[in-house]
Structure formats: C-alpha cells, structure tokens
C-alpha cells in the first residue's frame, strides 16, 4: 500500500466515527465517541510498532517512536485532536472520494441541492488533478482534525518501515475536546517528555502557523417574563428580544464574516430560547492582548447597561479565557519554526506563514512549557457540509513530518 492509499484507507475509516465534542458536558472527554476512537488508535499504534502506547483516564493517547540514531537529538512531538467541531452534525459521515478532480462544481447531494462550487469557494479549481474527499452534503467531514491525525499515523508507519531515515525519539499524542478549547486541560507535558512539538491541525498546503488568537467564550442567559400576549402591556419581558438587543450593541463589522488577517471579532455561535429564557454563546477573539481585554470589557459593559435598564436578573454573564497568543512562547525557540520552514522548502512547498484565525492545542501547550507551532493538513472549509480535503496535500504533510524528524537528527 502506497502513502496515498494508506491515507485514504485510514482517513475514510476514521471520519466515520462520531467524535464531536460537547460544550455542555462536564466529563473528560466530553463524548464517548472520543474514547472509542482513542481505543482504536491505541491498537493501531501498537500494530504499527510504536512503543509506550498509553491512553489515560481522560482519553489522551500517547506513543513513542524510539530513536534509531546514536546522536543526542531533542525529543520532538507531533499532535492532533480526536474530536470534531460542534458547528454542524458529525454523525453518519459518508466520505465521497473524487479521483483526478476536474476542478469544476461537485454536486454533493442532489436531493438537497448541495453543490460545492468555484463561485462560492474560489480555491476549488486549484485542486484540479488531485484526489479530494468531500462530504455527502449532510454532515461535516471531520478533516479537522482527522486529516492531521491520519498524517501522523502514516508518517510513523513510514519511518518504521524505512529505518535508513535517521531520527531521534519522537512522541505522538492525540488529544480530546480541542474544538471546545479544553484540549490541553489534562495534558501531561512532563509525561509527554518532548522539548517541543508540532500540531498537525492547519489548512491548505504550506500553512505554517505560530501566532494564534487570544480567545474567550461568553455564555449569556437572558431572563424574561412571559404573560398572555393579549394582556402583556407593561408586564411581558421577552428574553429573545433581550438577546437581540445585546447583539445590536456589538459592532456589526467586527464579526467573522467581515474580518481577516490580524483583525479580531465577536462571534455569536448559538442562540436559542423563547419569551421566558434565551441563551446565547459568543466567542471573542483578538491577536493583540490589549484589544482582547478591551473586547471582554465591552461585553461586560453592555451586560451592566442592560442590567441597569431591565434589572440585575435580566442578563447573566459567564465569561472565561480559553487560550492566548502562542507567539510569545515560540519566539525564544524560533529554530523549531525554521526547521519546519526549511523542511517545506526542501520538498518544493512554499511556506505560507500567517496567523491562526482559530486555536490549536498548541496555543495552550506553548504556555504549559511545550512550544508547539502548527502545520498544514490539506483541509478546506472546516466545520461544515462543504468541508473537503486533498489527499495529495495530505501526502505532502506526511513528507513534511518525515523531513522535520530527519532534519532534527541531521542538525544534532
């Protein structure tokens, strides 16, 4: 089985396991599917030939590829996450393989009229000639991050079968609940034992990221008073309208759909409820720490104003920081970025260095003493029915993992 075949076989099998995390759950991991998937990976890591394969009570999977050199090489790690996003259903994923893609629109689901078009997704024609894997238009795909996870598995398998490629000790970890910001919450950096690591959790070819958002989540509960609408004057307080009012105070142009690059945003992730009670969940993002704090204060001030207007119980805010910009922790060990950059260049991949408009486990791990930049995996349009991945780019990601391992040994 060549690299491409192994990537397709593993990836299409992995995405069929429902591993969506759950923001409302207080277990670790938050969903049983992640445990099921972790157990499968433990067996497969052992089959490949990795040692020290473990899965702890919190669902964290770790394994070792022993060094095959006498040189004193720093221990490096590669990480991916077990869970998939909560934004769209990840149950009953039916991956569709399109070999030698022609670059034109793909009808994902004729019955539901779901079509992946170059008009909506201009990058699509650039994958002409590739093997791409899409959804069937009814679920997300889960390439975030089962593409990265698959690439790590395939790279480790390749290194074991090609001992002529010299490398130091490599640690592998698969973490739960990344999509809800809890990935590293129970990650044992000491047990992992790497000097630094890379998350395989990026997007298109060449992506190399070591700046991330500062991130917070805000849960708002709006409490209303429900009465018969016919006699509601001066009595009714509509909780859903309170939620609408809160949202109206946020700057319209500072939302994900209007921002790019280094611009931050407020994002209403979910809103549900009725007259009696409504709940809204926002995420707050900014690269600049000072601006990040300003955004949080803005939310608090709006809540305070509404409480003064409608009563203390009308709006209840729960806000917590999720992770911080990892740049501060990467800069002192800049060589780990340089090695990844050089690895890509040697494979004729043009590195595309840009800030992560999102988070990876690396954001938090960097602050826990494990500096962790992020590398591309080949996926596009994450978290929805138009998600797809290029197997050709996945193959390149595998080559980058192998080349990084080789270069650390060579430069030791």
Curated annotation (Swiss-Prot):
Keywords: Aminopeptidase, Cytoplasm, Hydrolase, Metal-binding, Metalloprotease, Protease, Zinc. Its main location: cytoplasm. It is found in: Cytoplasm. GO terms for biological process: peptide catabolic process; proteolysis. Its cofactor is Zn(2+). Its EC number is 3.4.11.4. Gene3D superfamilies: 3.30.70.360, Zn peptidases. It catalyses: Release of the N-terminal residue from a tripeptide. PROSITE patterns: ARGE_DAPE_CPG2_1, ARGE_DAPE_CPG2_2. Zn(2+) 1 binds at residues 81, 144, 201. The keyword Transmembrane does not apply. PANTHER family: PEPTIDASE T (PTHR42994:SF1). Cleaves the N-terminal amino acid of tripeptides. This is Peptidase T. It comes from Bacillus cereus (strain ZK / E33L). The lineage of its organism: Bacteria, Bacillati, Bacillota, Bacilli, Bacillales.
């Amino acid at each position: 089985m060549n690299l491409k075949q192994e990537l397709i076989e593993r990836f299409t099998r992995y995405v069929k396991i429902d591993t969506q995390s759950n923001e409302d759950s207080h277990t670790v991991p938050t969903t049983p599917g992640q445990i099921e998937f972790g157990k499968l990976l433990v067996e497969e890591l052992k089959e490949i030939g990795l040692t020290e394969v473990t899965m702890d009570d919190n669902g964290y999977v770790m394994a070792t590829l022993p060094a095959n050199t006498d040189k004193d090489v720093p221990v490096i790690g590669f990480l991916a996450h077990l869970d998939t996003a909560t934004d769209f259903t990840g149950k009953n994923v039916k991956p569709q393989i399109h070999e030698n893609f022609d670059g034109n629109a793909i009808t994902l689901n004729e019955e539901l009229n779901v079509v992946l078009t170059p008009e909506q997704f201009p990058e699509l024609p650039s994958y002409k000639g590739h093997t791409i894997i899409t959804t069937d238009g009814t679920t997300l795909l889960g390439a975030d991050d089962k593409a990265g996870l698959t690439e790590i598995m395939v790279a480790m398998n390749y290194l074991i079968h090609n001992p002529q490629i010299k490398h130091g000790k490599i640690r592998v970890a698969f973490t739960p609940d990344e999509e809800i910001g809890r990935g590293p919450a129970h990650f044992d950096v000491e047990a992992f034992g790497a000097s630094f690591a890379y998350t395989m959790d990026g997007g298109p070819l060449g992506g190399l990221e070591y700046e991330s958002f500062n991130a917070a989540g805000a849960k708002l509960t709006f409490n209303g008073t429900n009465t018969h609408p016919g006699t509601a004057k001066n009595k009714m307080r509509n909780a859903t309208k309170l939620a609408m009012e809160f949202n109206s105070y946020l700057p319209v142009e500072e939302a994900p759909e209007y921002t790019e690059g280094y611009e931050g945003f407020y994002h209403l992730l979910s809103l549900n409820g009725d007259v009696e009670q409504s709940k809204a969940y926002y995420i707050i993002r900014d690269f600049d720490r000072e601006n990040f704090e300003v955004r949080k204060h803005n939310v608090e001030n709006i809540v305070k104003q509404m409480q003064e207007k409608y009563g203390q119980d009308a709006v209840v805010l729960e806000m917590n920081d999720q992770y911080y910009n990892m740049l501060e922790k990467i800069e002192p060990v800049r060589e780990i970025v340089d090695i990844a950059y050089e690895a890509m260049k040697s494979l004729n991949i043009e590195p595309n260095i840009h800030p992560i408009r999102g988070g990876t486990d690396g954001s938090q791990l960097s602050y826990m003493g494990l500096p962790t930049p992020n590398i591309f995996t080949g996926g596009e349009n994450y978290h929805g029915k138009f998600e797809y991945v290029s197997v050709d780019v996945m193959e390149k990601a595998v080559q980058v993992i192998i080349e990084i391992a080789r270069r650390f040994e060579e430069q030791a």
